[in-house]
């Protein structure tokens, strides 16, 4: 199933005029920030949805396909906002509050006001805008799928920058997710400033270091 505009069309029929899709990337990583994006699609997309046929849930696309989709979203979005919460704040707040903070920052950085939000499996307390929380929203709503692309590509680029600072961890390869390569690097070099020290196995490693 590919994302489409059926949910957006339902909201428009209820009288909402400007809709933003919101999604995040990096929630389950051992290292790096949580990045969220908010996307308002341009009116032409509602007239010609095929313009974004290349846009899908970011997890279903290759890196090359995501870059192509990213370019299309940039071209056919009325507004894009991005919010980034670094690893040390993920540790300080916890992953759920950090994710909501990133989403809120993305919403607040939009260049236009919105009437309703479509959010992938989440709600934003304190935001006085009608919200639709959609399970697997990035596979159902084109607005959320577009946000997932922006969030994922933005975060991947940040992790490529981190890789240039700390090449021994392989951030450019795994983007901070838990892989055997990442685990071996953690054991060999210990955590970097980009690592989330409250996440396993980073916490396990720190506990072992403290007890030795």
From Swiss-Prot:
Its cofactor is Mn(2+); Mg(2+). Residues 17-211 form the RNase H type-2 domain. Signal peptide: none annotated. Coiled coil: none annotated. One of its GO terms (molecular function) is manganese ion binding. It is found in: Cytoplasm. GO terms for cellular component: cytoplasm; ribonuclease H2 complex. Disulfide bonds: none annotated. InterPro entries: RNase_HII, RNase_HII/HIII, RNase_HII/HIII_dom, RNaseH-like_sf, RNaseH_sf. A divalent metal cation binds at residues 23-24, 120. It catalyses: Endonucleolytic cleavage to 5'-phosphomonoester. Manganese or magnesium. Binds 1 divalent metal ion per monomer in the absence of substrate. May bind a second metal ion after substrate binding. Its EC number is 3.1.26.4. GO terms for biological process: DNA replication, removal of RNA primer; mismatch repair. PROSITE patterns: RNASE_H_2 (PS51975). Endonuclease that specifically degrades the RNA of RNA-DNA hybrids. PANTHER family: RIBONUCLEASE H2 SUBUNIT A, RIBONUCLEASE HII. HAMAP family: RNase_HII_B. Belongs to the RNase HII family. This is Ribonuclease HII.
């Amino acid at each position: 199933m590919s994302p489409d505009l059926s949910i957006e069309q339902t909201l428009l029929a209820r009288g909402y005029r400007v809709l933003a899709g919101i999604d995040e990337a990096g929630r389950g990583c051992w290292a790096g920030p949580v990045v969220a994006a908010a996307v308002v699609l341009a009116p032409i997309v509602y007239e010609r949805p095929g313009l974004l046929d290349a846009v899908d849930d970011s997890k279903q696309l290759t890196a090359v396909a995501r870059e192509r989709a990213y370019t299309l979203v940039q071209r056919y979005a009325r507004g894009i906002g991005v919010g980034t919460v670094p690893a040390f704040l993920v540790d300080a707040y916890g992953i759920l509050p950090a994710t909501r903070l990133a989403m809120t920052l993305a919403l607040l950085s939009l260049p236009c006001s919105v009437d309703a939000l479509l959010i992938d499996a989440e709600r934003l307390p304190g935001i006085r805008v009608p919200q639709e929380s959609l399970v697997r929203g990035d596979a159902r709503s084109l607005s959320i799928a577009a946000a997932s692309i922006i969030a994922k590509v933005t975060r991947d680029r940040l992790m490529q920058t981190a890789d240039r600072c700390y090449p021994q961890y392989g951030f450019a390869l795994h983007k901070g997710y838990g892989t055997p390569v990442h685990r071996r690097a953690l054991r060999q070099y210990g955590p970097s400033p980009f690592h989330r020290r409250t996440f396993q196995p980073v916490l396990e490693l720190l506990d072992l270091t403290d007890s030795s």
